[in-house]
């Protein structure tokens, strides 16, 4: 432990493990520690089920009907991977995919007027969908064709829209789309949590809809993937990558002090020993005085013995409740997975509800989502602070990740990873570069 490292990483959340893997591949000497005895930090999957009961201080042990505790791997943070998104690219380029198995989520649903409807995943489904009327469908189709053909590098595809100036609100007007379709597009396809995006330049939204369509095109049922045995497999996959490249891992390591001299980090003290470093990466829990709270997220893990009604008995799905439908500023999400993903006992389903907290009574805010899940066998409620670093870390060389937000995919997490990478190295994160470095070491073409 009394050694000199290029980078020390504290916490084994997904952000930390990916950065640790990338830094190791880049030839840096990395020491990675976590005070917990398990991988994953805030984004861990908890097993056995008994540990989940203890964690949420639920008295007694799980009833017999829950099956064997070891058959459960319950995510603390509900997220899916966009099939064509940044995290999948990171997994492919680093070949961490060899440690993981994925399943396509069976469907995405959207809540409207108290009922849930399937988000169409084919042209035929779109035509048959009762989400919108016939004329609306034609206009919507025209809009989707425009988005599909849109190419940032080819102004001929802009059709009079300036992607850096025209707002999304004006683009919707141009295609004469009604409020329901706008809600559906912004929240179920572009996956925005609020309506702030309407007055922003439209290129970001167009790219998000493209990401959704391209992800959907890869597998057909939905744009989302989920790893067998739970999301806790992801940080472990990147930890393995780091280890292959000489990274050192230590779990169950109490961190006594982050040592700072003249405003810069020089090392970490643990169990009386000091490991020195040039840069430090950590999650907010290790540096409470260097982060600030910008909001809260409520998450409720629900154990069910039945698929969710009106989802065609799907054993995995996502439900989006757009904020307009329930008089809120931000959407409510439901992520559902089940025994089919080796995360629950046979015949059991796990549905996790999440949203950004807006009132003094967060549990009331998510009632519309819980009503869709009835009857619920057991609930585990958590309210977490959203923490962000107070500064960029370029002075102290302490680079702090953000806590996981209420979105149900990893795109914002990947943005944070790329952002920290740039702050640490001064250069943009380049997927292709990553691939070349790996091939140099493995000797592949």
UniProtKB/Swiss-Prot annotation:
- Tell me how this protein sits in the membrane: Peripheral membrane protein
What keywords were assigned to this record? Answer: Acetylation, Cytoplasm, Golgi apparatus, GTPase activation, Membrane, Phosphoprotein
Q: Where does it reside? A: Cytoplasm; Membrane; Golgi apparatus, trans-Golgi network
At which residues is N6-succinyllysine found? 57
- UniProt modified residues of type Phosphoserine: 130, 382
Sorted alphabetically, which PANTHER family does this protein's record hold? RAB GDP DISSOCIATION INHIBITOR BETA, RAB GDP-DISSOCIATION INHIBITOR
Of which family is this protein a member? Answer: Belongs to the Rab GDI family.
Name the UniProt record assigns to this protein: Rab GDP dissociation inhibitor beta
Species for this entry = Pongo abelii (Sumatran orangutan)
